[in-house]
Regions:
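Glycine- and aromatic-enriched mobile tails/lids
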Residues: 137, 401, 420-498
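N-terminal FAD cofactor-binding segment of flavoenzymes
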Residues: 32-94, 435-438, 442
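Beta1/beta-strand and adjacent pyrophosphate-binding region of the FAD-binding site
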Residues: 15-26
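Predominantly flavin-linked oxidoreductase catalytic cores and closely associated redox partners
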Residues: 127-146, 161-326, 336-347, 351-352
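A glycine-rich dinucleotide-binding beta-alpha-beta segment and adjacent secondary-structure elements
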Residues: 337-404, 411-413, 429-446, 452-458, ...
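An active-site-proximal "capping" alpha-helix that borders the catalytic cofactor pocket
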Residues: 409-424
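Intrinsic disorder/low-complexity segments
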Residues: 1-13, 140-170
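A conserved beta-strand/loop capping segment in the N-terminal third of enzymes
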Residues: 56, 72-119, 123, 127
């Protein structure tokens, strides 16, 4: 291997600080967990010197896809994971709770306020030094000044320096949390570090619409199932009941069969941004572009993100043929994103096709959907259950670059990597029980898998119950109760360790 393992005393690095590369969700959570335990952190973030194609502001923990952290219910896998993280004093979940916007039983945030608050909190930590420089592989022809203020290329042009990953690894413990948009320069050094070229995939972001441009004569407010007219419910009683749904969580856009089929036809024929063949093969199912999903069949969307189950159209008193949902995107309640409408359509086509949806004829799109490149390593071959690199114990990975998929999952991986980076000083490890969601995820990414793919939190990765339960809700409740019980025991052990 090009990088040699740093000699340690008692299994721990001799440096007095831990370096974290990447100021996203995983990196910020890791910084907090390490700093609160009295160890200094150097947090490297390349913004504002350099931005990825999807990022646009200088704050840490910037959210570029959906503003939803998914369900808060314990009977939902991601809801369970959030509850575990709350027990573990997750800074980012606490902040998300503080800046939450209405989203029914889900946790959705005002993305701007979330990033601002996380940035303020990290900046206020005495043990954290934020270094606004890119980490990666410097060119052989670059001359770096002694104070790391500039680099000069062969033509004499000065620019911001690139901090060497190799040097950081040689000096001490490093957590690489650079996310799905890891720079090309750093990707090259990661290849040298791991000896593995990793994998690439794409996910997509949905458009955001100005609320005032939505035709509320067609659209209606309400949550799935609670808005629906009961089987024996009188029409007038139902209308009176749903009248109280005003300004309640989701805006729903009903479609009849003719409207849906026309929309589907135009969507499947719309122009998209061209991808390379290898990119097309690597689209992650959990964030599949709606136009790709639509091409799988005319009814695919009606059984997916546009399913009408649980709704009644106030205009007809009947279930719609299909329903498009819009979710509040900011605390002011003036912006709404299109649920499940991650897309790679050209901007002009998005305006044309999505305006065919009843209620969006005059929609003002404040942000169009875009595709993002995502990079993740072959974690089952490279990492153990603590997100520690098997070939170099002073290197940890965290976040979506490890193959965990989702905001909450990324935060969880950052927390685990941080705890174990701290424990490296005492030659010990923190492994969460596989019965917990946080433990099951870390076990998944470390388990050999020839067809390794990104994974969200889900009950399928937990050990099954001894008793067989057919009722899905009851089964998930028991799995969640068991996880919280195991987490309680783990908390006692953590108190002894720290």
């Amino acid at each position: 291997m090009p990088f040699k393992k740093l000699k340690t005393i008692n299994g721990g690095c001799m440096r007095e600080y831990i370096s974290i590369i990447g100021g996203g969700l995983a990196g910020c959570e890791a910084a907090y967990q390490i700093a609160k335990r009295g160890i200094k952190v150097k947090l490297y973030e390349m913004k504002p010197d350099k931005f990825s194609p999807a990022h646009s502001n200088t704050n840490l923990a910037e959210i570029v896809c959906s503003n939803s952290f998914k369900s808060n219910l314990h009977t939902n896998a991601c809801g369970l994971l959030k509850e575990e993280l709350r027990l573990l004093d997750s800074l980012l979940i606490k902040t998300a709770d503080e800046v939450a916007v209405p989203a029914g039983q889900a946790l959705a945030v005002d993305r701007e306020k979330f990033a601002e608050e996380v940035t303020k909190k990290i900046e206020s930590l005495e043990n954290v030094e934020i270094i606004r420089k890119e980490v990666g592989k410097s060119g052989d022809n670059l001359v770096v000044d002694e104070n790391l203020k500039s680099v000069t290329d062969a033509s004499g042009v000065k620019s911001q320096p690139i901090v060497s990953l190799k040097k950081l690894v040689e000096e001490g413990i490093v957590i690489i949390a650079t996310g799905p948009l890891t720079s090309d320069s750093l990707s090259k050094e990661i290849v040298e570090l791991t000896g593995d070229e990793g994998l690439h995939f794409y996910d997509a972001a949905a458009p955001i619409i100005e609320k005032e441009s939505i035709d509320m004569n067609i659209a209606f407010w309400g949550d799935r199932y609670s808005q629906e007219r009961g089987k024996d419910e009188e029409l007038e009683s139902w209308k009176k009941r749903i009248k109280n749904n005003s300004e309640n969580n989701y805006i729903n856009l009903p479609m009849n069969k003719e409207e849906y089929e026309n929309f589907w036809k135009e969507l499947t024929q719309a122009e998209v941004v061209e991808l390379h063949e290898f990119e097309k093969r690597e689209i992650f199912e959990g964030c599949m572009p709606i136009e790709i999903m639509a091409k799988r069949g005319i009814d695919t969307l009606r059984f997916g993100p546009l399913k009408p189950v649980g709704f009644t159209d106030p205009r007809t008193g009947k279930r719609p043929y299909a329903v498009v949902q819009l979710r509040q995107d900011n605390s002011e309640g003036n912006l709404f994103n299109m649920v499940g409408f991650q897309t790679n359509l050209k901007f002009g086509e998005q305006k044309r096709v999505f305006s065919l949806i009843p209620g969006l004829e005059n929609a003002e799109f404040v942000k169009y959907g875009v595709m993002h490149r995502n990079t993740f390593i072959n974690s089952p071959e490279l990492l153990d259950e603590t997100y520690n690199l098997k070939t170099n114990n002073n290197v940890f990975f965290a976040g979506q670059i490890t193959g965990v998929e989702g905001y909450v999952e990324s935060i969880a991986s950052g927390l685990i990597a941080a705890l174990n980076a701290v424990m490296m000083y005492d030659k010990d490890r923190v492994i969460f029980p596989k019965e917990t969601m946080i433990g099951a995820l870390s076990k998944y990414i470390a388990t050999p898998n020839k067809n390794f793919q990104p994974m969200n939190a889900n009950f399928g990765i937990l050990p099954q119950l001894e008793e067989r339960i057919k009722d899905k809700k009851l089964k998930y409740t028991k799995l969640a109760d068991r996880a919280i019980k195991y987490m309680g025991n783990t908390m006692n052990n953590l108190d002894n360790l720290f």
